[in-house]
């Protein structure tokens, strides 16, 4: 059985270790909060995939009903359940399969978010997750993922090597192909080989694509940023179009 990380240490490393690291990781939460406020997104019925310890709830208006789904590999879901044990409007579900979304009725959520999670999902399962999300969602979708291609990848690999941080192993050929965006030549393993452009296409196939934004520097194109944020909306049904 895989040993779960110490959650306090994990959060401290992400959000309290140096200004630069905190700025990078907080950018996605700040983006979601700002987008919800600016677009007046309805968050009354909120679904989150990869919720970890429920940190996003600290940055958005409180939903009337919130469902957080997580694989709980790192123990974050245990902490979320403990923190919200007395709040019946918050439901946390441990899940490793898109089949768990089958229990929800169609159009039962007004907003969906998934932060730094899609890159960890098996590519075959990701399609199934998006199919189910498109069914249960009648509203806005917000997804953030890391940028694992282009010149940014070379910078990230160099920084991780300098600071001695753990990183997915690339062959020299894979690193070259990833740096020029030839992701089909890179073996896929979680972050490694993940192509945000393919995810954008998958979302565009199922939703009305609103924007693709680079983070943390929104004035730079996504390919030159560390993180990519995708905003989309449920397509209008024939009934809504007729109305």
Specify the residue positions occupied by each region the protein language model found:
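S-adenosyl-L-methionine-dependent methyltransferase catalytic module, highlighting the catalytic core
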Residues: 3-27, 99-100, 122-237
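Conserved SAM-binding loop
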Residues: 32-153, 228-239
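Short, cationic low-complexity segments
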Residues: 243
């Amino acid at each position: 059985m895989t040993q779960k990380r110490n959650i306090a240490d994990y959060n401290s490393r992400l959000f309290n270790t140096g200004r630069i690291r905190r700025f990078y990781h907080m950018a996605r939460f700040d983006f979601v909060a700002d987008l919800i406020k600016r677009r007046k997104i309805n968050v009354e019925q909120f679904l989150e995939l990869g919720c970890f310890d429920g940190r996003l709830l600290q940055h958005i208006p409180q939903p009337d009903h919130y469902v957080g789904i997580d694989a709980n590999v790192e123990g974050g879901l245990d902490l979320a359940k403990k923190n919200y044990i007395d709040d019946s409007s918050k439901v946390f579900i441990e899940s490793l399969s898109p089949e768990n979304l089958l229990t929800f009725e169609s159009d039962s959520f007004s907003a969906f978010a998934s932060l730094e999670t899609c890159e960890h999902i098996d590519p075959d399962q990701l399609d199934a997750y998006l199919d189910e999300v498109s069914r249960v969602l009648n509203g806005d979708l917000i997804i953030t993922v890391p940028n694992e291609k282009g010149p940014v990848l070379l910078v990230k690999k160099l920084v991780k090597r300098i600071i001695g941080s753990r990183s997915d192993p690339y062959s020299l050929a894979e690193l070259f192909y990833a740096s020029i965006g030839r992701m089909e030549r890179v073996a896929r393993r979680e972050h490694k080989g993940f192509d945000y452009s393919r995810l954008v296409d998958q979302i565009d196939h199922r939703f009305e694509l609103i924007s693709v934004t680079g983070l943390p520097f929104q004035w730079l194109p996504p390919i030159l940023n560390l993180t990519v944020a995708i905003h989309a909306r449920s397509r209008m049904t024939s009934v809504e179009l007729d109305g």
